[in-house]
UniProtKB/Swiss-Prot annotation:
This is tRNA pseudouridine synthase Pus10. Residues 100-206 form the THUMP domain. GO terms for molecular function: pseudouridine synthase activity; tRNA binding; tRNA pseudouridine(55) synthase activity. It catalyses: uridine(54) in tRNA = pseudouridine(54) in tRNA; uridine(55) in tRNA = pseudouridine(55) in tRNA.
Length: 454
């Protein structure tokens, strides 16, 4: 123990440096645990054992000095003052007769590590956790401001905060009682505790389900669309549903998950979105469903997929459990797409014109201003996107089908119509005819296993 309880060490400059601040005990009668916490980064032992050893060593040293001072008849007031401070902080082994001081309460921990108090908090937390299904947890410790201020005043370079120690020790106890594992990165539940006020509340972290969806019919938005008039509150226009459209991909997928998990709400995160009148075919669009405050986490994904797919309007594929960062990937990962468009032209079209169209649009840069149809909700910007490949097939004199492989974020309807010159070039400008998109399907999102990157 001599390496840490020695009062001084030699610095690189050759000067003595204080490492143990016993003087702090004159102002604050820190208990063994709290005094040891000031030097928590020294030695592999508990804070209580470390603090006890430091105090006993100093008390022994002071008692010896005082006895010698008495024998020699010299002043020992300074040593006596510190020895009394040690007695107030809980050192009751002092043998000097003129030291009769009662132990004072520790101003730092205020007894929060008392075994009975810890058990009381533990039982309270377990009672709150009973109604939830979870595997991992984290302790969130909340400390009063006056305790934080005290820590700043007495801080040493070797100290750990009382917040750290309480969270660690309480977490160990909870892990043993529940046979659950603490998890700092992705806990199912965070148990928030203020050990000073004995307040406890739970933070139920979301359950994330990732997969892909196919939208097989037109006329359904991807997410719930609030009524524009009442903004979701319910009015005569929306038949008091609060919605512009009666159903969405989000609601079709979320409903069975909410029923199975007993969650309070769900949020849908898609890798982009298709228009209401556009189908999403092929192998589907990646999505993450965020279920808020689930009570049940162990659910049968295959069974839920079967239930969703029975609807006939939406299908889900490749369902698996995800994590929070999966939903962020969508916002930062560009991906190309393949579309099928049915185009209607004002004048007759020829096979030669369609061949010209394929040639003109191959590896072509498109300059596209925000479409007029969405200007009311999006900034008027110019986007630069690229069309890589186009394949056409004639349907009749005024209709043809296009397979378009292009950058994500390109508005296909406006690529076809030209949007009164706001998209350049366009199918209309190349063919010199008025063309419109009659039907549009997303055939593939070239995401390179977007969800697996997480």
């Amino acid at each position: 123990m001599a390496s840490i309880i020695n009062k001084q060490i030699i610095s690189p400059t050759g000067r003595n440096m204080e490492i143990i601040n016993y003087e702090i005990l004159k102002k604050y009668p820190l208990c063994d645990r709290c005094f040891g916490r000031l030097y928590a980064k020294l030695l592999h032992t508990t804070n209580t054992e470390r603090g006890r050893a430091l105090k006993l060593y100093k008390a022994l040293e002071l008692e010896a000095k005082i006895k010698k001072a008495k024998e020699k008849g010299i002043n020992y007031e300074e040593e006596l003052e510190l020895l009394k401070a040690l007695a107030k902080s809980g050192v009751d082994e002092i043998r000097l007769e003129d030291i009769e001081i009662e132990k004072e309460n520790c101003p730092w921990c205020r007894g929060i590590f008392n075994k009975q108090k810890m058990e009381k908090l533990l039982n309270k937390a377990i009672e709150l956790l009973k109604e939830y299904d979870f595997d991992t947890f984290l302790i969130g410790t909340h400390i009063p401001e006056e305790i934080k201020d005290l820590e700043k005043e007495i801080e040493t370079e070797f100290m750990e905060s009382i917040k750290q120690e309480f969270g660690r020790e309480f977490g160990k106890m909870l892990a043993v009682r529940l046979d659950k594992a603490p998890d700092k990165e992705y806990p199912d539940i965070v148990v928030h505790i203020n050990p000073y006020t004995e307040e406890i509340y739970l933070q139920i972290n979301p359950l994330f389900i990732k997969g892909r969806y196919r939208k097989l019919v037109r006329g359904i938005p991807q997410t719930r669309w609030p009524c524009r008039k009442c903004r979701g509150k319910g009015c005569e226009l929306c038949n008091y549903t609060g919605k512009k459209y009666p159903i969405s991909v989000e609601e079709i997928i979320a409903k069975p998950f909410l029923e199975a998990t007993k969650g309070v709400d769900a949020k849908f995160h898609g890798a982009g979105r298709e228009d209401i009148d556009v189908r999403m075919l092929g192998d589907g669009r990646p999505f993450v469903l965020e279920i808020k405050e689930p009570k049940i986490r162990k659910i049968d994904l295959n069974k839920i997929a079967e239930e969703i797919n029975k609807d006939g309007r939406v299908e889900v594929l490749n369902l698996e459990f995800g994590v929070r960062k999966d939903k962020v990937i969508f916002k930062n990962t560009p991906h190309r797409k393949t579309y099928r468009a049915l185009v209607e032209c004002s004048d007759k079209i020829t096979d030669e014109e369609l061949k010209l169209l394929e040639k003109e649009l191959e590896n072509r840069t498109i300059y596209q201003k925000t479409p007029k149809r969405v200007l009311h909700r999006r900034a008027d910007l110019e986007r630069i996107r690229k069309v890589y490949k186009v394949k056409t097939s004639k349907v009749d004199d005024n209709h043809f089908e296009m397979i378009i492989y292009c950058d994500g974020g390109l508005y296909i309807k406006e690529l076809i119509s030209g949007d009164d010159g706001r998209t350049n070039p366009s199918v209309s400008s190349i063919l010199n005819k008025n063309c419109i998109c009659k039907e549009l399907d997303v055939l593939k999102i070239h995401d390179n296993n977007l969800l697996e990157k997480g």
